Design a protein with these regions (language model features):
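Transmembrane beta-strand segments of Gram-negative outer membrane beta-barrel proteins
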Residues: 20-33, 92
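N-terminal targeting signals for Sec/Tat export/insertion, comprising classic cleavable signal peptides
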Residues: 28-55, 85
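Gram-negative (and chloroplast) outer-membrane scaffold detector with strong preference
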Residues: 47-112, 128, 139-143, 147, ...
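Solvent-exposed loop/turn segments connecting transmembrane beta-strands
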Residues: 30-42, 63-71, 152-163
Length: 171
């Protein structure tokens, strides 16, 4: 019985170890939410395994315009995957990138108490270097498709907490 248990444990850990090998790649998309700006966005990502369990993750996220402000981020991160159960990996996130935000120019009229004022503002934009730390989880639906969820703290362009849920295709 002990030999059977040990054999099953080795087989289980081997499945997790072979699921992510050096040279493996994946592409995917995500739905994002930036809590500081209360903005929803979409993301695209590319992942490459440098060595078993250690991957680089390149991500572009575009946040939909809200109150005249739009934003995007481009990030490069590193993740080390820990296999915690069959088909389930968790990983820390550490990365650097840029964040760009822009506010459109608006012309509007404000009326209050019988007074009418015309307000005009020029647009503005900002591009900053940012860092991020966080944690994520991945569930492998099959050998080729996985779902993931990330919770990240981004800093350098103000501090924002970002949640992202997505799906990736491995090849």
């Amino acid at each position: 019985m002990k030999k059977l248990f040990v054999t099953l444990c080795i087989a289980l850990f081997s499945v997790g170890a072979f699921a992510q090998e050096k040279g493996d790649m994946a592409v995917g998309g995500s739905l994002n939410f930036n809590t500081k700006a209360s903005m929803f966005g979409i993301g695209a990502r590319y992942q490459y395994f440098f060595i078993d369990k250690l991957r680089g993750d390149g991500e572009f996220a575009y946040y939909f315009k809200k109150d005249g402000v739009s934003m995007f981020t481009i990030l490069a991160s590193a993740n080390y995957l820990f296999n915690v159960a069959d088909k389930i990996n968790v990983y820390p996130i550490a990365g650097l990138g840029i964040a760009h935000s822009s506010a459109s120019s608006d012309d509007y009229t404000v009326s209050y108490g019988g007074q009418t004022v015309h307000v005009s503002s020029d647009g503005a934009s900002s591009t900053d270097f940012i860092g991020q730390i966080g944690a994520g989880g991945q569930y492998d639906f099959s050998d080729k498709v996985a779902g993931n969820f990330d919770a990240k703290l981004q800093f350098g362009h103000g501090t924002a907490f970002v949640l992202a849920a997505g799906i990736i295709y491995k090849f």
